[in-house]
Design a protein with these regions (language model features):
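Active-site recognition of the HExxH zinc-binding catalytic motif
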Residues: 93-105
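Surface-exposed, interaction-prone regions with an acidic/low-complexity signature
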Residues: 13
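Metalloprotease/metallohydrolase-associated module, dominated by Zn2+-dependent proteases
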Residues: 2-5, 10, 18-19, 23-82, ...
Length: 141
C-alpha cells in the first residue's frame, strides 16, 4: 500500500528507451506509426476482430532496439526513431511485430517471418500480414 507521499509509477515510460517530447517533428513521426496501426486495425476488422486502443510512443534513437511492447494491462508500444528513418517497409514490419506482442502476447519465434527476434533485411509485407492474422485468430479462438 502506498502512503500519501508515494507516487504511482508512470505507465508511459520504459526502462529501455527514452520518450521524445512532442513537437511538430515528433508528431509527424507518430503519424507515420499511426498509419500502420490503422492498417493493422483494418486488417483485423476484415476478419471480424476489434482492435483495442493502443498507446503509441516515439523514442530516442537506439542502435539495438527498434521497438518495445507492453504486455497485459494498458496496451502500449514504443517505436524507436531509428526504425522510422529506415523506411516504410521496415517501419510497418516493426509496428506489426510490436502490435502482435502487445495484442496477442506473441513471443519471439526464430522461424517466423514476423516474430523473429532479429529484424529481417527485407521484410515480406504480405507474409507478415498473413502471420499477423494467424496470431490474431489463434489468440481469439
Amino acid at each position: 500500500m502506498r502512503t500519501a507521499t508515494q507516487r504511482r509509477p508512470r505507465r508511459d515510460r520504459t526502462k529501455r528507451l527514452t520518450n521524445k517530447r512532442m513537437n511538430d517533428a515528433v508528431y509527424a513521426e507518430r503519424r507515420k506509426v499511426m498509419h500502420h496501426v490503422y492498417e493493422a486495425r483494418d486488417l483485423l476488422r476484415s476478419v471480424g476482430i476489434d482492435m483495442p486502443r493502443v498507446q503509441i510512443r516515439i523514442c530516442e534513437r537506439d542502435p539495438h532496439i527498434l521497438g518495445v511492447a507492453r504486455l497485459g494491462g494498458d496496451l502500449a508500444i514504443w517505436i524507436s526513431e531509428s526504425v522510422i528513418n529506415m523506411g516504410e517497409r521496415h517501419l510497418r514490419h516493426t509496428v506489426f511485430h510490436e502490435l502482435a506482442h502487445t495484442l496477442f502476447q506473441a513471443p519471439h519465434k526464430r522461424g517466423c517471418p514476423l516474430m523473429r527476434p532479429f529484424h529481417p533485411c527485407r521484410p515480406d509485407l504480405k507474409q507478415g500480414e498473413r502471420v499477423f492474422l494467424e496470431l490474431a485468430k489463434a489468440y481469439h479462438s
